[in-house]
């Protein structure tokens, strides 16, 4: 909703500068600028917080568009790795006064707002929800998940349901549905030795976590990418372990340099000026 409002704001400003433009040109031009804003925020604010400077150095090591770079989204990134944010979900939804967003007006369990679109359709509730989100503190990425998404996801209390879906299970099965290789396949790709046994995993996680995996999986080659990746200890400067940090940095490097329309490329057709 924030981006919808920003798009409309941009369109209104462009209409002032270019009164002869029609609706379609205003829409598409505002869209181009909005994409540039999203790219800028992602690469200069979000990713540095998630990955740290070492991995950002890898992403930003080149600034020229390269037509030989494949910018498509990898299966591992889409079906597993970038869903690390699911572990950052909290159990409560805060609503705050937009004039003082740090002051919570109301907090309610996340599971209680499933199937209640009034949070976004009611203008007053929408503003309060956005204000609450602006200061809500997320959980750290890791193997611990909020109870609202652990067996209570999309639970519909009004229909008498007592059990919901499990987000972790969904993530595991999504990876299998997509035919993702196991976690062990990605270790050498990210500069680590392939594990021969569960105890070899202690180079990236605690001994207790390795034991937990051995109790669930028959062989270290069976471990799902999402599960082991989210269990890895964060590397220095990053919120994530080496495997997830590696796969995300590779994806973001290719997404940027393989996109001829990326906002910062000098040759991009999306380069902006005041009238654009």
Where on the chain are the PLM-derived regions?
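Polyanionic, low-complexity segments and short acidic motifs
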Residues: 1-276
